Amino acid sequence: MEELPFRVFVGVDWGDELHQVCSVLGGKPQQRRFEHSGKGIAALVSWLMELCERQPATVAIAIERPHGVLIDALLEHGFAVFSINPKQLDRFRDRFSVAGAKDDSRDALVLASSLRTDPQAFRRVEPEDPLIIQLREISRAHRNLERDHRRLCNQLRDQLNRFFPQVLELSNAADEPWVWSLLERFPSPEKVRHAHQSSLERILREHRISRVTALEALEILKSPPLPVAEGVVEAATQHIALLLPRLCLVNDQRRQCGQHMDRLVKKLGETEDAQPGTKREHRDVEILLSQPGVGGIVAATVLAEAHQPLVQRNYHVLRTCGGIAPVTRQSGKTRNVTMRYACNHRLRQAFHWWGNAVCQCDPKAHALYLEHRRMNHSHARALRAVMDRRLNILMACLRSGHLYERDHAPKKGLDNT
């Protein structure tokens, strides 16, 4: 972006209902406002076409959000769209108001002017594969369902601790479907007192549980109950009766979401570019899945949240977006290296899972982890060091186009360049 081939610079302050747009052509700003609707976006595109005399390639548009309906419409009509981190935009805003004044028209002007004067702070937004868009939505929905599942399980566990802790001896987290079936059939110690061994055998058989027998489970459940105040058991069982259907629903949706992610990853792996000689995305999927420690959820999250760095083979952007690269603050003789907090938190969580898994299945990764732990580094910091190495290896594999082989790991590209 050293020499921008653009004549018109436009800033868009995005809104749920209205978009404030400022264009800078020849140093003179023009402000317009458009509704967030089909008619409003069409009017915005028409206005931009008039400004550039039907040459959309000469228009550069700055906006905070890298995704959305407005961005898709602008890209579809051939405009160049650039995104910026909101924190960086806040710093640029100080140029126009020392007092910190802020409004929509000023933000649109700041975006347009900053893109013209400081293009290196912006990142160009490229059109995305429809499969990547679907995968991103499904992977984010899966993460939300995981959070809901954990929250509901914690609520169930709290209720069981009040009056029926024997169930937690069978499943400490209370997150297994067979435990929910058990509670539907026997919701209280009073009900368990009249339970038969055959009833528990049926539940265990339906859910294929073999680590505990029906006799052992019955013995645990029939142990002396907690002495509780009158009404506690009734209140807790009613609360659990409300939780169980929600837990079953969220668990089914989570399973369906995971299956959908697997299908999308497989479909993406089978996709070939139409133009001969270009890199095929399905090869990238194969290479990613060949890395030790990478499972379906991690692969889907990395492909969805870090698609551009993977396509561009940009190791530095990938480690920065995932929170692996540290932040160094140095002034005079003082030097402080800290964890990076400004990153894609979904991608960072995926890298954390990947790091945990690779330490269990790869001896070299485990040795590197232990080396950092011996230096009194925390578990998370040691995992970031492991993942820094893994991302470098991943990029080397992507550049060479070869699958990862543990005994013949590629050496080219491991110089952090």
Predicted regions and their residues:
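A detector of single, family-specific signature residues
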Residues: M1-T417
